[in-house]
C-alpha cells in the first residue's frame, strides 16, 4: 500500500516574477484563466468558496465562477443555503482556484455582495431548463427523506411552470470584491513563487512576493 506521506510531485513547468505580471490582478487572473482554458484544464471555473458562520466555524465547498469583471468574481446559488446564511451574517469570504495541470493556484480574499436583480435574472434565464426547475425544487442544505422527494418537487414545478419558470426569489448571484489576490506557481524543491496583490486605500494595487 502506498504511504500517503510518500506522495509528492516536484513542480517545474513555469516561474512567476513581479516584472512579468500585469499590475492589475484581475487582468492577471484573466491571463492565467485563458491559459488554463487553452490547456484544457477540466472545470477551469471551479473554485473553492470558504465562508465562516457566526460562531467562527469555517465551511468550504466548490462553486462555479460565472462572471469576471473589473469589480470581481461572480457566482450564483440559493440565498437560503448554508453559505447564503453565512454570507448574510459575515460577508468576508475567500476563493481558491487550483489548476493542477499548470501547477498553479489563485487565492482571493474579500467581501461579498449580492449582484443586481437584473444580473441574477439574466444568468438564471440562460441556464438549461432542468437547472432552472432545480432551483425551485431544491431547498438547498435542508434535510430530505429521500431522492424521490426532490424528483416529485421537480415534477410539480415542471407542471406548474412548463418551460418558462421565473427566477425564484431565494436564488441569485453574489460578487466577491477582492481585497487580496495571490498567484501561486509551483517550483522545484518546494521553493514556489507566490505574488500577492493588496488593494490600497486609493483603489490601486501593491504587489509583494511571499515566502513559499
Curated annotation (Swiss-Prot):
Keywords noted in UniProt: Flavoprotein, FMN, Oxidoreductase, Pyridoxine biosynthesis
PROSITE patterns tied to this protein: PYRIDOX_OXIDASE
Function: Catalyzes the oxidation of either pyridoxine 5'-phosphate (PNP) or pyridoxamine 5'-phosphate (PMP) into pyridoxal 5'-phosphate (PLP).
Known pathway: Cofactor metabolism; pyridoxal 5'-phosphate salvage; pyridoxal 5'-phosphate from pyridoxamine 5'-phosphate: step 1/1; Cofactor metabolism; pyridoxal 5'-phosphate salvage; pyridoxal 5'-phosphate from pyridoxine 5'-phosphate: step 1/1
Highest taxon, organism lineage: Bacteria
Coiled coil: none
Protein name per the record: Pyridoxine/pyridoxamine 5'-phosphate oxidase 1
Gene that specifies this protein: pdxH1
